[in-house]
């Protein structure tokens, strides 16, 4: 295992406090000058690692000493991370640059539980940290032969444009009210397991041609800007139990892939279409964000599709590079990703313990890295209703770019367990110093692990949840509780359906999930709309073209429901969302006739359904 090297660096405050200076972040009115010094100094001739796995910095802020703890942002880049740019003649150039020894860190201030930090140590220290609710920035002073840095509050940066920037999302495209009103106790075991699971967003960032020109046609400068931004986004989403990993970066260095418009909604649609028809075919990812140098109409700084995550067309957002300070642009991008993850704008009653929250409709001068109570509830409601699967895909152990580090709570190649540092570990089965099982221990975690030993073969580790499920049993040879379920095709729900992959999908339940408790399945005549081959009715898509159902397959296309609420007189309701046109289709495995179930838009023999 790699031994984590802790380096203490003192930042001695220079006995001068500046009144005004022009920095990368802009014109700063009030700042402190500090000089990083390593303590203790390395012995003469010792080899200095380029970027340590963990570091500490001591310095003073407003005359008070603070200690900044930093850890390298492991998993910031995926193993298959790639970068694409274009030659002057339009030739695509894709590389897989080595990013193992990167220089991007997360951290916190000692004795401040609510503090955060996002720092680049590539050329000096650049980034932000929060201290007692205030946001501070640090960046190197560009002085010859000097290690001087400036530390200053964001509020001391002169604002170039006093007009507030806003997100362009102006309305709800979906309603999660039926879910919001449900209590946690009403969740199915499947929904509860989904909520508890850690989520991963595999992100591709794209910089347009205007960005390339804005940063002097310098690929390295644009790349560094994007790295700084994603490092902040990663910090923001940690508190939501979501890990954001950069899997790809694309820079349009010869021309834009489409004509960008100042109308943000038009540009978003064009970008989303390009992503689906081009980018997804050559780079697997969950979400794409465009960073553009164009000025959108009015105060709009960005736009994203609400609830579009995992959708080939709608898992996308666009953000204007509207501020020199990268972490403000990062907050805007995190905001648009929040929309993709099902979160709408905060209302006046929403709180996060700060002056502003990530999902505020207007980008505040008070930078915030916190999601509000409303955002958390909306995100949970979205997850319960849609259960998007792409964000459950955990990176393989070999996908972690950096060598394994014992003590980071992530079980990597060569580790049996990882319970944190020796000071924080509370796991009696795991040796925190080596991340190996203690002598005599067979396991450290898992539903079939009890007091460091495998539970006996045949021990029930998870009860059956319904008639299509089976009680899961331990094998006596593993800590894992393997999921088992009844064979596909077994009748269920009083012969109204057939078991399919452990569930009993029937149309009535699907209508209730979409329209509420008063919903029921429409008359057969409504399903004839599936013969038309448009968004009102179809059975499948081929190259984004809706294919009409054959007459025998009409019960395997769009689901038609009747809502018996007094205000609803339509006997043929469909659920349509511009963020996901396929939502509201009859689910695979649903009974479509006696002895038959839906499979790929066809009504087939129940034993052939897959």
From Swiss-Prot:
Q: Which GO terms describe its cellular component?
A: extracellular region; plasma membrane
Q: What is its EC number?
A: 3.4.24.-
Record-annotated residues binding Ca(2+)?
A: 405, 408, 410, 412, 415, 418
Give the organism, scientific name. Answer: Gloydius halys
How the protein is activated or inhibited is described as: Inhibited by EDTA and EGTA. Not inhibited by PMSF, antipain, pepstatin, and iodoacetamide.
Superkingdom, natural source: Eukaryota
This chain is glycosylated at 218
- Tell me the Pfam families matching this sequence: ADAM_CR, Disintegrin, Pep_M12B_propep, Reprolysin
Keyword tags: Apoptosis, Calcium, Disulfide bond, Glycoprotein, Hemorrhagic toxin, Hemostasis impairing toxin, Hydrolase, Metal-binding, Metalloprotease, Platelet aggregation inhibiting toxin, Protease, Secreted, Signal, Toxin, Zinc, Zymogen
The prosthetic group or cofactor this protein requires is: Zn(2+)
Q: Which SMART domains match?
A: ACR, DISIN
Function field: Strongly inhibits the collagen-induced human platelet aggregation (inhibition of alpha-2/beta-1 (ITGA2/ITGB1) integrin). Hydrolyzes the Aalpha-chain of fibrinogen, without cleavage of Bbeta- and gamma-chains. Degrades type IV collagen (but not types I, II and V), fibronectin and vitronectin and also integrins alpha-1/beta-1 (ITGA1/ITGB1) and alpha-5/beta/1 (ITGA5/ITGB1) (but not alpha-V/beta-3 (ITGAV/ITGB3) and alpha-V/beta-5 (ITGAV/ITGB5) integrins).
Q: Indicate the residues removed as propeptide on maturation.
A: 21-182
The similarity annotation says: Belongs to the venom metalloproteinase (M12B) family. P-III subfamily. P-IIIa sub-subfamily.
Catalytic center at which residues? 336
**Cystine crosslinks:** 310-390, 350-374, 352-357, 406-435, 417-430, 419-425, 429-452, 443-449, 448-474, 461-481, 468-499, 492-504, 511-561, 526-572, 539-549, 556-598, 592-603
Q: Where is the signal peptide?
A: 1-20
Which stretches make up the Disintegrin domain? 403-488
- Identify this protein by name: Zinc metalloproteinase-disintegrin-like halysase
Record localization: Secreted
Which GO BP terms apply? apoptotic process; proteolysis
Q: What terms describe the molecular function in GO for this protein?
A: metal ion binding; metalloendopeptidase activity; toxin activity
| Binding-site positions, Zn(2+) | 335, 339, 345
**Subunit notes for this chain?**
Monomer.
Location of motif D/ECD-tripeptide in this chain is: 467-469
Co-factor note (free text)? Binds 1 zinc ion per subunit.
- Every copy of the Peptidase M12B domain together lies at 199-395
